[in-house]
């Protein structure tokens, strides 16, 4: 009876360990499916808009950005600018667009604000900074978590180098930015996030060092002309998540086989021992 209990305990321990090992991959896969669906829904809703709708949304965003550019303290007092939540909210879900970083295989919906609920599953637009629609004297800041066991998000943002590009899609615009500055600052240091007169910037922000999170990694991009080949390319979550969902069970299979072989060997050894005792008596 004691041996049977030991076997059951070992099996339970194994499956608990297997669940712990698979959790990050499976959870990330579910999150990426959610992100992909959110982007697809956004794109479908955008396709239904008329040219007049596009113009109205962009005019509202440009007017908002003009207010941000005119206020040097906008980042510290975002409540000064009413109407933020509704500007560019085409779907009514808070999504204003999506960001694609091909080098690290990331495509994330961009939501209004940087609440923890947003940053757990997607990218958030930092309130008090320019909306990401481009234009002179704009500087949008997009933030996402790093190192979550449930989602990759900006985990690999540190792999970007000066000269790499990323795109932001808002309504029918695909805006391309080339990384021109990478810096690490304290959370209280915000000078690198302010609007620069005449410049069109987007900064990607996440915590660093990995797992410690005492500083902020800022990856700034300057606006460049979008190449035709990038205007219709999407790095979907489905495309980049197939591999982990397949490889995780493959990695777990050897452990399962080892356990099964051990159980089989132990059972045979016990039977053999019992047989020898029976012959002795």
Description of each model-found segment:
Residues 234-281:
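C-terminal single-pass membrane-anchor helix
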Residues 3-244:
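Solvent-exposed, non-transmembrane regions of membrane-associated and secreted proteins
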Residues 1-3, 278-279:
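C-terminal accessory segment of soluble enzyme catalytic cores
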């Amino acid at each position: 009876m004691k041996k049977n209990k030991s076997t059951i305990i070992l099996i339970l321990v194994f499956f608990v360990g297997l669940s712990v090992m698979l959790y990050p991959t499976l959870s990330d896969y579910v999150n990426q499916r959610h992100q992909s669906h959110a982007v697809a829904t956004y794109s479908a809703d955008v396709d239904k808009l008329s040219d007049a709708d596009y113009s109205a949304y962009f005019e509202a965003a440009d007017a908002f950005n003009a207010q941000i550019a005119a206020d040097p303290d906008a980042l510290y007092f975002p409540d000064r600018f009413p109407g933020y939540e509704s500007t560019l909210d085409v779907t009514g879900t808070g999504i204003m667009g999506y960001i694609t970083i091909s080098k690290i295989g990331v495509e994330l919906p961009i939501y209004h604000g940087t609440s923890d609920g947003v940053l757990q599953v997607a990218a958030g637009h930092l309130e008090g900074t320019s909306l990401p629609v481009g234009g002179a004297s704009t500087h949008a800041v997009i933030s996402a978590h790093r190192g979550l066991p449930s989602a990759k998000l900006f985990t690999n943002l540190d792999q970007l180098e000066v000269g790499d590009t990323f795109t932001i899609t808002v309504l029918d615009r695909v805006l391309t930015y080339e990384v021109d500055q990478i810096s690490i600052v304290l959370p209280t240091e915000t000078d690198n996030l302010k609007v620069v007169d005449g410049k069109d910037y987007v900064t990607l922000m996440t915590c660093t060092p990995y797992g410690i999170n005492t500083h902020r990694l800022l990856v700034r991009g300057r606006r460049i002309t979008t190449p035709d080949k990038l205007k219709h390319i999407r790095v979907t979550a489905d495309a980049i998540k197939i591999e982990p969902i397949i490889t995780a069970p493959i990695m777990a299979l050897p452990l399962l086989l080892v356990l099964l072989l051990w159980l089989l060997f132990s059972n045979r050894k016990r039977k053999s021992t019992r047989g020898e005792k029976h012959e002795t008596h």
